[in-house]
């Protein structure tokens, strides 16, 4: 079983310090929500983000959306060889059942995430997605993997096909992919750093390469 973690994902509700910013207030009014109920999004809150620490990398729920669509629609997931988790910058973990089918439409995805943050689990009765307060280290400890790989542009350069074979040789590997647009992880993560290409890749590209080559190694 491959465990894929989108870590330090820039997925969060609008922080209290900018909830009265005009960009946030106007956006929330258009969507008929209170500012504190809205997901932070750099597309709409760019001016407000300038007032936040790390504002140049925050408000990127689109990264999570694309990564999850790629992972959940993969053959590995459909065949029961994949588990996917999202860990946020605020140390929340989103558990996602394999049968989950996320909205393809980005605005509907935002609405789903807003409901998740508000209710703790969605949809009611099925709980396909569940969020809890938990640091990355505790999530990895719960998974109890036999190895942990951190996808990192400064990691050991390994061809994607070879990396897929390495993953398939383990019983319970964890692969950590950064859910942020640029820069490094904010905190150290124990594991082996791996790079799949000589240049930086977007998170969703890394997710696709990891899963497709894992599938190939399994003969799926």
UniProtKB/Swiss-Prot annotation:
The record marks 60, 101, 104, 108 as: Interaction with substrate rRNA. Disulfide bonds: none annotated. The record marks 62 as: Stabilizes Arg-60. It holds the Pfam family EMG1. It comes from the Archaea. It catalyses: a pseudouridine in rRNA + S-adenosyl-L-methionine = an N(1)-methylpseudouridine in rRNA + S-adenosyl-L-homocysteine + H(+). Homodimer. This is Ribosomal RNA small subunit methyltransferase Nep1. It comes from Thermococcus kodakarensis (strain ATCC BAA-918 / JCM 12380 / KOD1) (Pyrococcus kodakaraensis (strain KOD1)).
